[in-house]
Amino acid sequence: MEARRSGNFKASIWDDDFLQSLTSPYTAKEYLKQADKLKWQVKVIIKETKQRLDQLDLIDNIQRLGISHHFRDEIQRVLQNIYEKMRVECPDRMLMEKDLYSTSLQFRLLRQHGYHVSQDVFCSFMDGAGNFQAVDDLKGILALYEASFLSREGENILGSARDFSTRHLKQKLEEITDPILAEKIRRALELPLHWRLQKLEAIWFINIYESRFDANLILLQLAKLEFNMVQAQYQEDLKWLSRWYKETGLPEKMNFARDRLAECFLWALGFIPEAHLGQARKILTKIAVLIVIMDDFYDIYGTLDEIKVFTEELQRWDINALDNLPEYMRICFLAIFNTANEIAYDILRDQGINIISNLRRLWAELGRVYYTEAKWYHSGYFPSTEEYLNVAWISITGPVLLFHAYFSIMNPIDMKELQYLEQYPGIIRWPSTVLRLADDLGTASDEIKRGDVPKSIQCYMHETGCSEEEAREYVKQLIDTTLKKMNKEILMEKPTNDFGATAMNLARISLFFYQYGDGFGVPHNQTKENLVSLIVKPICLT
């Protein structure tokens, strides 16, 4: 009998008793009335703000405080007006009179909302040799740095802007006497604003904004109240999921796998943070839980013969043909089968569209690529970097997650758009590739020790003979290139489309989870702190 391997995974620190104990007073109607009043006041503030720079600062603050979804129409009208004026004014006015901060902020906000603004707006800040000129304006340089991350492939001016601003900010960081500016710079250098999770950014920015002498107290109060009210909804979502998880018996029956319900919920929350989309978060969390189990028996617990049969059963999708599977695989298959049918039933009932064949294909394809990687591992095969990535961007489960997100949030589902998405265009491929590469950077060392297929780092080292450090730099460059492709294909085409935003969020949650290592499989203090901040600890209103 073939000995089974173990991942030696740590137990979950989030038990059901603790999760069920979570409560919040912010479900009361009085808070909803208070929030509605504050939202009306903010709309007045937006309407009465007339100066262009004041408008840009206001929009930026609203976004970073995590309340912009309440003011989409108002923000869009302001930015449309700014963009139209920018197009008809002379070049000097377009450049905001050569003010680096204003030009950079305007560029970032307009691009973020899908407006096609040329990188040439930064030419007046460069010398004859094409280099950015040193300026004594750290606030402006920080704004330039943040703007540079909305670049697309081939935009060399923005590439120079990033190099210049990064170098300058690092050099000046220890000399800064303003503690707020220093903290902003330090955080930006860790991960730029464009690739941060909105909800976590809001927690941090609320604290920063509150310490400013010019803070607008109406914005601040709404941001705090909004965060606490949404947190109350997150608590209810997670409590429901914990009951579901316990009732399935999966934690006991699949005790070889990682028990990561709370972390799966954090993935779903990063994907879809909007309070009213709780059902979508529940679906994504369920899917993530099932993926983790399946991943762990393909990678570690299952024998090659077992996973070959399981892969075949996923292709057949027949619950009457499971006798050849061991018990743990029968349970996993039925959990996938029942969950898929439940999702398909809800959409058929609500929209009259049958997506069960779409879901079957997703799970069958995932099984195929998992099995390909398992054969690589068991045979000792080292794929080339290209061969690895052609399989691994799918095996990281990005397509499964993105399509379940699409089905969960799009109502009505556009069948032509769905057919287009099933060809795996950039809106599917690029976020999935970022997830794959970020995962490899964070987990490769531990997974190789446990016994897993070589990752992109090892494949590149084997292919080129380079060091691990050089391979990691290569993977980081691949991530950067892929993020630029995302900016072009997703942000510049569908910035206000809910699914476009969700696809961008997959890249963001990937960078977040693997920024300090394996923040999912081996949850570290940073993951725990973020979960506490988002789900457990409210923000003080006073």
From Swiss-Prot:
A motif (DDXXD motif) lies at residues 295-299. Its EC number is 4.2.3.81. InterPro entries: Isoprenoid_synthase_dom_sf, Terpene_cyclase-like_1_C, Terpene_cyclase_plant_C1, Terpene_synth_N, Terpene_synth_N_sf, Terpene_synthase-like, Terpene_synthase_metal-bd, Terpenoid_cyclase/PrenylTrfase. Disulfide bonds: none annotated. Binds 3 Mg(2+) ions per subunit. The keyword Aminoacyl-tRNA synthetase does not apply. CDD domains: Terpene_cyclase_plant_C1 (cd00684). Pathway: Secondary metabolite biosynthesis; terpenoid biosynthesis. Pfam families: Terpene_synth (PF01397), Terpene_synth_C (PF03936). Mg(2+) 2 binds at D295, D299. It is an enzyme of class 4 (lyase). GO terms for molecular function: magnesium ion binding; sesquiterpene synthase activity. Mg(2+) 3 binds at D439, T443, E447. Mg(2+) 1 binds at D295, D299. Its cofactor is Mg(2+). It comes from the Eukaryota. Keywords: Lyase, Magnesium, Metal-binding. One of its GO terms (biological process) is diterpenoid biosynthetic process. It catalyses: (2E,6E)-farnesyl diphosphate = (1S,5S,6R)-alpha-bergamotene + diphosphate. Belongs to the terpene synthase family. Sesquiterpene synthase converting farnesyl diphosphate to trans-alpha-bergamotene as the major product. The Asp-Asp-Xaa-Xaa-Asp/Glu (DDXXD/E) motif is important for the catalytic activity, presumably through binding to Mg(2+). PANTHER family: (-)-ALPHA-TERPINEOL SYNTHASE-LIKE, OS04G0344100 PROTEIN-RELATED. This is Trans-alpha-bergamotene synthase. It comes from Phyla dulcis. The lineage of its organism: Eukaryota, Viridiplantae, Streptophyta, Embryophyta, Tracheophyta.
